[in-house]
Amino acid sequence: MLFRYLVWLFRFIEVKNVASISLLVIGSNSLTTAISNNTSTTILPTTSSNSLMTAIPNNTSTTISPTTSSNYLTSAISTNISDKEEDTPFSTDKTVFDGLSPITLYRTIRSTLNDTSTKTMTDHILTRPYRPTTVIFHSDTPQPVKNATQGNIIKKTYRQVLTFFIQPNPLFPCFKNHEVFLNLANILNTILCIILIKNV
């Protein structure tokens, strides 16, 4: 299944003519992967570790930020996330809830748009040192996207990626709506990336 997903993913990237991609590493407590000494733009997954950890040590690639994982679900968060409804939230999805909610992910992504430093914060069990490059997000209304000239197209592209997992999918019949983001994180953790589209 993972191989079929990867084939779809890279075909999707090719069709959308993505100029460049970067990585947002997501660790989880169910899937573990290690990539060591990556010195090129090629990502070569190695044998999974027995410990609940994901690591990219000694990484010199310009598209990957070195980071260290923990034994629970982790993601990129800067220090300026608040509980105020200052930003336009994700589309309301009553089936996605608890700590890993759309609004939490939305604030996480929005908070990294103009952040050029590596910061760490804990919010809804999400924490990750991360140096963002280009970030896209899913929203019902137009919002600024760093280094992007076609924000609406980028958001539409990202929406399609999410929809691929949210809708009933023969590749992943075990998916349940309320588990979609957790499962998505687990799958993306296996290949160690979320697509961050730049200059589409």
UniProtKB/Swiss-Prot annotation:
<feature type="repeat" description="2">
    <location>
        <begin position="49"/>
        <end position="69"/>
    </location>
</feature>
<comment type="similarity">
    <text>Belongs to the asfivirus I196L family.</text>
</comment>
<keyword id="KW-0426">Late protein</keyword>
<protein>
    <recommendedName>
        <fullName>Late protein I196L</fullName>
    </recommendedName>
</protein>
<feature type="repeat" description="3; approximate">
    <location>
        <begin position="70"/>
        <end position="91"/>
    </location>
</feature>
<keyword id="KW-0677">Repeat</keyword>
<feature type="repeat" description="1">
    <location>
        <begin position="28"/>
        <end position="48"/>
    </location>
</feature>
